[in-house]
Structures are given as C-alpha cells and as structure tokens.
C-alpha cells in the first residue's frame, strides 16, 4: 500500500514537471500605434526612439505619428514622464509623482517639455502628427535626461 502511494506521488510530480501547460494574456484593445519621426540631431538614426544631442537653451519640436487602426473614433491622451529606477535597479517609465522623485534628479523631462494639445481625436484609419516642444535649461548638462511619452486611450 505504501509502495503504491509513493509510486502515485512520483507519477504526479513527474506529470507536473513534464506536461506542458499554456498561459495566455489578453493585450486588450490596442487599436492605435505610435511612430517617432526621427529628427536630424538624432545621435543614432537607426533607433526608433528619440536620442537627441541638444545644447543649452536649445528649443526643439519632436514629432510622433499616431495612427488609429480601429473601426471606431478614438481619443488618445498624452503625457510626458521622467524615468526612475525600480526596486530591481531597472529603468521604470511608469507615470510617477514628480514631488516624490529622488533628489539626484536634476532635470525632470516633464519640466522641459510642453505638449500643446494633450488629447488627440482620431477617426477610423486616420493618423495625426503630434508635437512636443523640448526647451533645454540654460546651464550645460553633461548627462542624459531620460523619460517617456505615455499614450492612453480614453
């Protein structure tokens, strides 16, 4: 009897290890896409994100193309956030409260950017170009100002 119990337990353990199971996740309704329109002062033009070389007090417009791939009219909200480091030491681009930022953050990206229109309304199949203005501070900055543009469907 004890031998049957041990044999059954070993069979269950082996089954759990070797029988594949599938996990799926629903991405939701991602019915729009974003493409960065890379400017001339891009450091590496092969990158699909902005990596710009800018001078003190330089003002520059960056542009992103937003495309509605759905069959419905959609409204998209935009916001700029600064990058932080999570508990694992990885870069985190989630929207954070700037008042809780680490004191070592000298130039938060949201403070040097301006989005003239934070909402974009797109008809089905329509694309629009949105513009974000970056104004560098007066003093020269030897480093990287890291952040992200968040897009959220309303």
Show where each model-derived region lies.
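Long beta-sheet-rich domains in secretory-pathway and surface-associated proteins
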Residues: 24-154
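Sec-dependent N-terminal signal peptides of Gram-positive bacterial secreted proteins and lipoproteins
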Residues: 2-25
């Amino acid at each position: 009897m004890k031998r049957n119990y041990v044999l059954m337990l070993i069979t269950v353990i082996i089954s759990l290890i070797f029988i594949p199971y599938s996990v799926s996740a629903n991405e939701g309704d991602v019915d729009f896409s974003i493409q960065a329109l890379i400017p001339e002062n891009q450091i590496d033009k092969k990158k699909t994100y902005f990596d710009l070389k800018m001078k003190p007090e330089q003002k520059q417009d960056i542009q992103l193309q937003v495309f509605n791939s759905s069959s419905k009219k959609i409204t998209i909200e935009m916001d700029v956030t600064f990058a932080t480091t999570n508990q694992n030491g990885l870069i985190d681009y989630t929207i954070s409260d700037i008042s809780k930022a680490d004191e070592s953050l000298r130039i938060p990206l949201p403070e040097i950017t301006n989005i003239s229109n934070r909402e974009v309304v797109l008809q089905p199949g329509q694309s629009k170009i949105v513009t974000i203005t970056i104004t560098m501070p007066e003093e020269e900055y030897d480093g990287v100002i890291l952040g992200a543009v968040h897009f959220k469907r309303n």
